[in-house]
Amino acid sequence: MKTLIYSILILIGALSVAACANDVLPKPKGGLRLDYPQAAYSRVTDLPNCPFTFEANTLSAIEHKANSCDVNINYPTMKATIYLTYKNVDGNIRKLLTDAQNFTYKHTVKADNIAATTFVNDTTKVYGMFYQVYGNAASQSQFYATDSVKHFISGSIYFNVEPNYDSVQPASNYLQKDMRRIMETLRWK
């Protein structure tokens, strides 16, 4: 009987020792998953004395600066804003284009890359460039659009957080689609 008890105790002890082994397992890579609602757009026409209209995401809040045609498109849930700045073209198109391009390329200090895409819509006479900025730059996307004769508008995305590319990338990708939509739906009055 004693040997049976000793055998059971030895078996329990061996199982206890074997069960306490900590196998180190690699943790699977995880990524930040943020799901944003499907974008719905409506035409922004209530900008007094401004010679343009465009479509904006219905999730945004439009803030129009009095006595100017500057527009802030706020996204409170993402802590982001698309800033639109309008200028009249008065024989200064070259300066406006140079300023917009220089403004974008000032981000090269922090940016890993800047990809430029040409935008042309002959039907609506909207011509411009869209810039996607990669890396920890302050602005992840910028654009300008013009008719080359009377109108010039520029836009940029800024987040109200420290520019950590990995953290803002999901929201930035969502807002880049909105920014492209602004360019595509821009109409001069």
Task: Please describe what each predicted stretch is.
Residues 48-102:
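Secretory pathway targeting signatures of secreted, lumenal, and periplasmic proteins
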Residues 101-156:
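Signature of long, low-cysteine stretches enriched in small and polar/charged residues
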Residues 28-49:
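Post-signal peptide N-terminal segment of mature Sec-exported envelope proteins
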Residues 82-91, 142, 165-173:
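Second-shell loop/turn segments in exported
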Residues 21-25:
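Bacterial signal peptide processing site
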